[in-house]
Amino acid sequence: METILQNVPVGQKVGIAFSGGLDTSAALRWMKNKGALPYAYTANLGQPDEADYDEIPRKAMEYGAEQARLIDCRSQLAGEGIAAIQAGAFHISTGGITYFNTTPLGRAVTGTMLVAAMKEDDVNIWGDGSTFKGNDIERFYRYGLLTNPALKIYKPWLDQTFIDELGGRAEMSAFMTKEGFGYKMSAEKAYSTDSNMLGATHEAKDLEFLNSGIRIVNPIMGVAFWKPEVEVKAEEVSVTFDEGRPVAINGKEIADPVELFLEANRIGGRHGLGMSDQIENRIIEAKSRGIYEAPGMALLHIAYERLVTGIHNEDTIEQYRINGLRLGRLLYQGRWFDPQAIMLRETAQRWVARAVTGTVTLELRRGNDYSILNTESPNLTYAPERLSMEKVEDAPFSPADRIGQLTMRNLDLMDTRDKLAIYAKAGLLSLGTSTALPQLGGKE
């Protein structure tokens, strides 16, 4: 059964994920002219660079949509963002600075909620603006068919007729003008930007070249902290979690997760917190480069992980990190709602996040420069008296206890010496005086 349609489905309802930009505007009008019945669906993801959401459906109707709907996805996006923080679902980092998978989270919400809205309108063909070289074409494919097994996919950008007639932005702009809409292309930037409430992605064009970097980017969620003329004052901020959920910032309870993210974005954005420059592997295994913003996600993640390390033991933390790396990859691949992802996510939410209650106070400076000033939690297993360098009463263990513990290590040390000697005999190790390893003589 054919799932991907390569020609305009004449006379049929076609849902299009409509942003109001040139690409989707031209595609909608073009499909209308070719005989399709376009239905426009716009996701309100709290994009920081979108000024008027209500205007977008009006544009779609003007361009020929049979119906245009604005779907508020912000609560769902906030919920998935918190789940990602609870599970540490982030697998891409450079030098300890994390990419918070904000675009994959947005696609998970958009792909499911827009297709669900289409089902309500008996629309079973879906198109969007993703290209064949990127990740989104596969993410939307997976989430769309997961939500509606009867869904067909039609993307104008995979239709050779569309490409021949409207192959570039100049052609699209001329087409819209010819159709009587006077559409003018926005000023060309040196890169493209995609955003939602959780973060922004800047990529392509000049940013495809590694000798262009963060200095050509104009942040939309924070300040250009690398510019010396931009004043950034140090600021103290506290974040409170209750059973793994962020509930207050600076002592003020914020019940609505959307409002909490917006406040975290405002605070983190004043410092440029959460900006990163990453080289990553796309789903198709080719490398790409992106510059990312995520001020609120970064602030919440820092506070959450501080509590995790103060509350849980080493083995739990290790498993949390290993599972988080795996879950991050699944999220990136468009598998956030697959059973293996749900298993990893709910494990972290149940056995890690549930114990994370407390408040972390930080000082934010420029960019990702910060200090942790205080950590408070009723569940802390950090007890300074256990390892105090001062003399304490009722110490949990004595020098004699440590002597016994060290003596037990002799068993492991003997085995280790024997194995190193075996490796040396096989030529795998050099045990001469010029190496850091001592000269070992097996069981001698």
From Swiss-Prot:
GO terms for cellular component: cytoplasm. L-aspartate binds at T131, N135, D136. L-citrulline binds at Y99, N135, R139, S192, T201, E203, E280. GO terms for molecular function: argininosuccinate synthase activity; ATP binding; protein homodimerization activity. It catalyses: L-citrulline + L-aspartate + ATP = 2-(N(omega)-L-arginino)succinate + AMP + diphosphate + H(+). PROSITE patterns: ARGININOSUCCIN_SYN_1, ARGININOSUCCIN_SYN_2. Its main location: cytoplasm. SUPFAM superfamilies: Adenine nucleotide alpha hydrolases-like, Argininosuccinate synthetase, C-terminal domain. CDD domains: ASS. ATP binds at A17, F18, S19, G20, G21, L22, D23, T24, S25, A43, G129, T131, D136, D194. GO terms for biological process: argininosuccinate metabolic process; L-arginine biosynthetic process; urea cycle. It is found in: Cytoplasm. Keywords: Amino-acid biosynthesis, Arginine biosynthesis, ATP-binding, Cytoplasm, Ligase, Nucleotide-binding. Homotetramer. Belongs to the argininosuccinate synthase family. Type 2 subfamily. NCBIfam families: argG (TIGR00032), PRK05370.1 (NF003779). This is Argininosuccinate synthase. It comes from Delftia acidovorans (strain DSM 14801 / SPH-1).
